[in-house]
Amino acid sequence: MTISIRGARVIDPASDLDQVGDLHIEAGKIVAIGAAPAGFSAQKTLDGAGLVAAPGLVDLSVALREPGYGRKGNVESETRAAAAGGTTSLCCPPYTRPVLDTPAVAELILDRAREAGNAKVYPIGALTRGFGGEQLSELVALRDTGCVAFTNGLHGFASNRILRRALEYAATFDLTVIFTSQDTDLAEGGLAHEGPTASFLGLAGIPETAETVALARNLLLVEQSGVRAHFSQLTSARGIELVAQAQARGLPVTCDVALYQLILTDEALVGFSSLYHVQPPLRTRADREALREAVKNGVVQAIASHHQPHEADAKNAPFAATEPGISGAELLLPLAMTLVQDGLLDLPTLLARLSHGPAQALRLPAGRLAVGQAADLVLFDPQGSTLAGESWYSKGQNSPFVGHCLPGRVRYTLVDGHLTHEG
């Protein structure tokens, strides 16, 4: 299908393009920005007046819950939710049953994603078999199947020697390793950031050092091995400082933060709502401000939803017995727009952290709005609003933002020139 988008504000952070004009799509690719090519005839025209046309969002962590956790979500439901949030490309972590540590599991997810057709899905493989921290997964075979990176998540390693060997092996094949840096011993049994709020509520604390001790070790091993590394879900000011120092030394490291960490603090836990139970935990206002500044200055390249949908029973229990995680993919763009509304970021910078930045971090063919590129884009109304929860595609409704009126509204999401969401 040929499509013309007329009179939109076209923003491509990768090329610093920011202009009002037209955009033309043919055979799934962008064929012109501005005047239509000779002989071009649009079969469908979208009125872009007052709207922003931007690269489709690239979300680095959307738990699809398939295979194994159908009560929480599946590939179709969660990719549809992501499309509603403006996402066209997403990475799914290996938190499945069985764990995504074999090509067969990766192939299953990719087949289901192609059938759904809502977004481009890039699997992340488990670094060790079953997250056991002892034996490496079939990393090269997983890469050849389509895995773009590897992680052990919040699971530890049997020894630092095994971790070192894993990183050296990954470096040999130019594989990217994703770290969620949290020391398992220091964090064991913890439910909230160690501080006044946790003490007041009587919740076991997770100290900042659970992040920084693991992060310091991981950075040293990255430097020794030369592996490409991405640090996911940073939560603390000190953690940001360590990554910034590593980047200044020229280490091949990137990082992301969860969007909700830029909005919330541990003070949200007062009231014991399990909707705020996340791992790694929400931290202090000072930490939140440091994360925001790092997003602004580019130390943090990517903002991700870290979407973890749950069934109702997983959250309907005493706080300590609930499962951590927030269902966030569906609200990625409107919730992120609060950062623009509050004057923390300008719109091009926000879009860079939601598209080009994450794509670069994991070397994905996404995050660009340019002639010859795939027509993966989002068209949204920056002056509109979204009532969170008025429509909901994810199986998990575990979001503390449901019922909130958020700035911005996704009007169209397109993947390879095909409409995957219209709102």
UniProtKB/Swiss-Prot annotation:
Which parts pass through the membrane? none
Q: One biological-process term from Gene Ontology?
A: pyrimidine nucleotide biosynthetic process
Q: What's its job?
A: Non-functional DHOase.
Q: GO MF annotations for this entry?
A: allantoinase activity; dihydroorotase activity; metal ion binding
Q: What is this protein called?
A: Dihydroorotase-like protein
What's the family? Belongs to the metallo-dependent hydrolases superfamily. DHOase family. PyrC' subfamily.
The annotated subunit structure for this chain is: Heterododecamer of 6 active PyrB subunits and 6 non-catalytic PyrC' subunits.
UniProt lists the gene as pyrC'
Output a single Gene Ontology CC term carried by this record: cytoplasm
**Annotated InterPro entries:** Amidohydro-rel (IPR006680), DHOase (IPR004722), DHOase/Allantoinase_Hydrolase (IPR050138), Metal-dep_hydrolase_composite (IPR011059), Metal_Hydrolase (IPR032466)
UniProt keyword annotations, A-Z: Pyrimidine biosynthesis
